[in-house]
């Protein structure tokens, strides 16, 4: 529900919960992303049908996102994610502040050149696989902060996430095999039920309100992550 409506937080929230129960980071990320194949697919189709997708932006994010996902999934099996997480959290915290700041002044909708979208997609896919989530927070928050329309940004990022997730899961399967089936089934059922409703909410809520919600969510999650890394 949160991910489909705001374009983020599904993987981050669930991975944090799974890690707190003692599940290893690689297993948690693989489980969440396997479930996300179904939830992001459902969410992406819903956004597409409701006209929330910018096809040009979608094509520019797709390939770099998939490449970043492959690299991130591979590294997760060998390097502790705690080393990188604080830096991602600081970046997201800054993005959240920028988004909130822009809600209180006039924003001119704009587009981002392909040259700048490639590294954004690459970084988003990389940290998404590495930390069990991050595609939405990194890509959505950056694009909205740059002035992109929140509705089309969220819908487009959600649709692209399906293909990025599919690539990440394929990489995880080749390296470590199938993750825990019970975890995956539980995540799939809850996510698929909520996805269509989330796309409808995204279409109905005004852009300014969406930006405020996105900004607060990013800041909250970032502060929480930074605090956890300091313990």
Give the label of every model feature segment.
Residues 33-45, 93, 133-142, 164-167:
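Hydrophobic, membrane-facing alpha-helical anchors
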Residues 129-134, 157:
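A short glycine-/small-residue-rich loop at the edge of a beta-strand within enzyme catalytic domains
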Residues 155, 168-171:
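Feature detects amphipathic, helix-rich regulatory segments
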Residues 5, 40, 112, 162-163:
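Accessory recognition modules or surfaces
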Residues 29-37, 154-162, 192, 218:
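Transmembrane helix-bundle signature of multi-pass membrane transporters/permeases
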Residues 36-37, 102-107, 162-164:
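Short acidic/polar alpha-helix capping motifs at helix-coil junctions
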Residues 1-5, 9-21, 25, 46-131, ...:
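Juxtamembrane transmembrane-helix boundary motif
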């Amino acid at each position: 529900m949160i991910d489909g409506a705001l374009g983020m937080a599904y993987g981050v929230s669930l991975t944090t919960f799974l890690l707190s129960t003692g599940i290893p980071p690689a297993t948690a990320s693989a489980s969440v992303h396997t479930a996300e194949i179904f939830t992001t697919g459902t969410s992406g189709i819903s956004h597409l049908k409701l006209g929330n997708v910018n096809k040009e932006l979608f094509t520019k994010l797709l390939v770099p996102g998939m490449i970043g996902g492959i690299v991130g999934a591979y590294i997760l099996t060998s390097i502790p994610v705690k080393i990188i997480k604080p830096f991602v959290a600081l970046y997201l915290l800054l993005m959240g502040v920028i988004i909130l700041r822009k809600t209180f002044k006039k924003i001119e909708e704009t587009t981002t050149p392909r040259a700048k979208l490639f590294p954004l997609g690459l970084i988003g896919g990389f940290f998404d696989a590495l930390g069990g989530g991050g595609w939405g927070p990194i890509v959505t928050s950056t694009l909205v902060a740059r002035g992109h329309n929140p509705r089309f940004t969220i819908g487009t990022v959600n649709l692209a996430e399906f293909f990025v997730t599919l690539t990440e899961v394929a990489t995880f399967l080749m390296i470590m095999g199938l993750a825990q089936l019970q975890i995956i089934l539980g995540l799939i059922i809850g996510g698929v039920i909520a996805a269509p409703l989330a796309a409808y909410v995204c279409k109905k809520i005004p852009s300014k309100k969406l930006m405020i919600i996105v900004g607060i969510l990013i800041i909250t999650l970032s502060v929480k992550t930074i605090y956890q890394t300091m313990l």
